[in-house]
Amino acid sequence: MKQYLDFMRHVYEHGTDKADRTGTGTRSVFGYQMRFDLRAGFPVVTTKKLHLKSIIYELLWFLQGSTNVRWLQEHGVTIWDEWADENGELGPVYGSQWRSWPTPDGRHIDQITDLVAQIRANPDSRRLIVSAWNVADIPRMKLPPCHAFFQFYVADGRLSCQLYQRSADIFLGVPFNIASYALLTHMMAQQTGLEVGDFVWTGGDCHLYNNHFEQVQTQLAREPLALPQLKILRKPDSIFDYRYEDFELAGYQSHAAIKAPVAV
């Protein structure tokens, strides 16, 4: 994951110091892109240990269409707890928009089901898109989507994905987001009978929080290790039927975890 370390170093050394919504303060750049060949290994950061369980369960939770943290908590995942209300609700966040986007005439659009059907029927389409950025629903969301929009692309029998992330917490959030959408690309490829291609990560406001600088220096001093390979142990009937136990990262090794506070 040299690309990720280069990205972090670039923002740390050349970013602009800015205020932010949380009051923490950031150093940021506007606009950055990284490309990962998924055939060369699964793009998971190795210069610190990631909680892979949280990444996998969160993606499965999105695909369920859920917006309540209780299911995550039942599986030992607490990454959304800071934003949930007393009943565990987050408002119409990712899962709701992916699976049940409301229309003016009272219907709901399942973007994920439609996406799978489109990839199978018309792989050359330039409309293989899912958006979580629903302007009408944003006031009711506890946290508006950071990873807001993604598009798939098929060429030479390979499925690639590009994510646009409008707000990118480089130290804590981006490693999760890269791994999550790389995993989704593998799942989509399996479901549509394609091989994996590239995952392209594109960021808007790309920032390091001021209270992460010490951790950033620690991570930049570490040498990245070889990337693992993702193994999907079975092919479920649909994109919605995967389980946590279906995934294995063969050869995953990492440096020790680096703790850092979350800006809420």
Curated annotation (Swiss-Prot):
Positions with a binding annotation for dUMP: 21, 126-127, 166-169, 177, 207-209
Alphabetic keyword roster: Cytoplasm, Methyltransferase, Nucleotide biosynthesis, Transferase
Principal subcellular localisation of the protein: cytoplasm
Gene3D superfamilies membership: Thymidylate synthase/dCMP hydroxymethylase domain (3.30.572.10)
EC number: 2.1.1.45
Record-annotated active site: 146 (nucleophile)
UniProt subcellular location: Cytoplasm
GO cellular component: cytosol
The keyword Cytoplasm appears for this protein: yes
Gene Ontology biological process terms in this record: dTMP biosynthetic process; dTTP biosynthetic process; methylation
Role played: Catalyzes the reductive methylation of 2'-deoxyuridine-5'-monophosphate (dUMP) to 2'-deoxythymidine-5'-monophosphate (dTMP) while utilizing 5,10-methylenetetrahydrofolate (mTHF) as the methyl donor and reductant in the reaction, yielding dihydrofolate (DHF) as a by-product. This enzymatic reaction provides an intracellular de novo source of dTMP, an essential precursor for DNA biosynthesis.
Oligomer and partners: Homodimer.
UniProt record similarity statement: Belongs to the thymidylate synthase family. Bacterial-type ThyA subfamily.
Protein name per its UniProtKB record: Thymidylate synthase
Organism: Cupriavidus necator (strain ATCC 17699 / DSM 428 / KCTC 22496 / NCIMB 10442 / H16 / Stanier 337)
